[in-house]
């Protein structure tokens, strides 16, 4: 399984990918070719994210289709449109996606609180209109890694939900 989370800014995007089989963590920043290679290597695996059904899978597919992930992100978030409507090309990309978010009204931060976990936020604004500095990038990577780890915790606490889909 691959647990993943994207963070998208106007001039930067990154994804944290945790492979549960070999326990490796991969961070990809603004490198579509590296993401394509990773996807090709693991496209037969199950990819798990929090709200990935409505957001992350479309950012992934946009990058795989050489589209601007910021445009897709804005389409989904600012314009409140479903990601699948952005491009018919998305349907052609195989992705075995499992969304750990089973309740639309409970966000990851709320679940972290319920589990007694530390809630980590980023001070970097998502509407920043310039490339991230090295310090900001590092902060966002740490934030994203934390989100993936917490998504894995939520998954383990709700394993029966996953098993019911298998």
Language-model segments: which ranges?
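Gly/Thr-rich phosphate-binding beta-strand-loop-beta motif of the actin/hexokinase/Hsp70
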Residues: 1-19
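Short, conserved catalytic/metal-binding motifs centered on acidic residues
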Residues: 5, 49, 147, 151
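A short acidic (Asp/Glu
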Residues: 12-15, 57-63, 154
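Hydrophobic alpha-helical membrane context
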Residues: 17-19, 63, 159
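Conserved DEDDh/DEDDy metal-dependent 3′-5′ exonuclease domain
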Residues: 21-110
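Acidic, Mg2+-coordinating catalytic module of metal-dependent nucleases/exonucleases
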Residues: 101-103, 107-166
